[in-house]
UniProtKB/Swiss-Prot annotation:
Joins adenosylcobinamide-GDP and alpha-ribazole to generate adenosylcobalamin (Ado-cobalamin). Also synthesizes adenosylcobalamin 5'-phosphate from adenosylcobinamide-GDP and alpha-ribazole 5'-phosphate. Keywords: Cell membrane, Cobalamin biosynthesis, Magnesium, Membrane, Transferase, Transmembrane, Transmembrane helix. Its cofactor is Mg(2+). It comes from the Bacteria. The chain crosses the membrane at residues 31-51, 66-86, 115-135, 148-168, 187-207, 215-237, 247-267. It catalyses: alpha-ribazole + adenosylcob(III)inamide-GDP = adenosylcob(III)alamin + GMP + H(+); alpha-ribazole 5'-phosphate + adenosylcob(III)inamide-GDP = adenosylcob(III)alamin 5'-phosphate + GMP + H(+). GO terms for molecular function: adenosylcobinamide-GDP ribazoletransferase activity; cobalamin 5'-phosphate synthase activity. It comes from Frankia casuarinae (strain DSM 45818 / CECT 9043 / HFP020203 / CcI3). The keyword Transferase applies. This is Adenosylcobinamide-GDP ribazoletransferase. It is found in: Cell membrane.
Length: 278
């Protein structure tokens, strides 16, 4: 298990951990099944940064800062992955922009290029703005630390689910070829249940106003984020025929944005009373 965990961290982060000298598909599958737990570690790190920024920027007698802690939280997630997933999102945007005019094969070639085009820059800008804006809203509602934790786990869960047996690689080389179809359905289901359980527990014990209502909100965000990633994955499969490392990165970033949006939602008062949310 330790080898699989180290492999997961070396595949998904730039943390200074010693990974295996060689990663085969079997090991890659076990590592990708642990991707949500990598998200848990990253979420704890980013959540701590959000909380610390709130503390050091607080001004007595004034409303607490929300934008700066949100920017710091999103930045920490980008730094510990060296922008890997954002780069994948940018390449995915360029590939989608080229797909209709140039076809699947040319779009995949464009996704491999090191330069970023207009479509890639635009999609990264919009997704990051959504992440920062939604996280800022959750911070003002005193659930920012919980929100970034849930988003980090759910977005990495999207990568796990994208590597199940039903999803092929889009090309015969690269990260997609290494991990596509390697995660067993049972392991993916267990990962999903584990993320729901951790999200519920985190919501229940949240130091900034935890309780049953917050736990339900966190689980709802996991479900909606996972649903968004499923629909997006199906759409991308129709365009590219499989997954690549860039597609996984794009799924992670967009799922994180969707999860944060759910955590930021204002739920109507009758629904709050019915479900016990706050």
């Amino acid at each position: 298990m330790m080898l699989e965990a180290r492999t997961a961290f070396t595949l998904l982060t730039v943390l200074p951990l010693r990974g295996p000298e060689h990663t085969d598909r079997r090991l890659a599958g076990r590592a990708m099944a642990l991707a949500p737990f990598v998200g848990l570690a990253l979420g704890l790190l980013a959540g701590s940064a959000v909380f610390a920024t709130r503390i050091v920027t607080a001004v007595p007698g004034q409303r607490a800062q929300t934008l700066l802690p949100a920017v710091v939280g999103v930045t920490v997630l980008a730094l510990v992955t060296r922008g890997l997933h954002l780069d994948g999102l940018a390449d995915l945007g360029d590939g989608l922009g080229a797909w209709r005019a140039r076809g699947r094969d040319r779009a995949l070639e464009i996704m491999r290029e090191s330069t970023i085009g207009a479509f890639g820059a635009i999609i990264v800008l919009f997704v990051v703005l959504l992440q920062v804006g939604a996280l800022s809203t959750t911070i003002s509602a005193h659930r920012g630390t919980l929100s970034i934790l849930v988003a980090a786990m759910t977005s990495r869960l999207a990568a796990t689910l994208a590597c199940t047996g039903a999803v092929p690689p889009a090309r015969p080389d690269g990260l997609g070829a290494l991990v596509a179809g390697t995660v067993r359905t049972r392991d993916a289901a267990l990962s999903f249940l584990a993320v729901c359980a951790v999200a519920a527990l985190a919501g229940l014990l949240d130091f900034d106003g935890g309780g049953p209502g917050r736990a339900l909100r966190a689980v709802l965000a996991v479900w909606v984020g996972t649903g968004v990633s499923f629909l997006l994955r199906r759409y991308l499969l129709t365009r590219f025929g499989g997954i690549t490392g860039d597609i996984l990165g794009g799924l992670i970033e967009i799922t994180a944005a969707a999860t944060l949006l759910v955590m930021a939602m204002t739920i109507p008062t009758p629904v709050l009373h019915t479900l016990g949310l706050h």
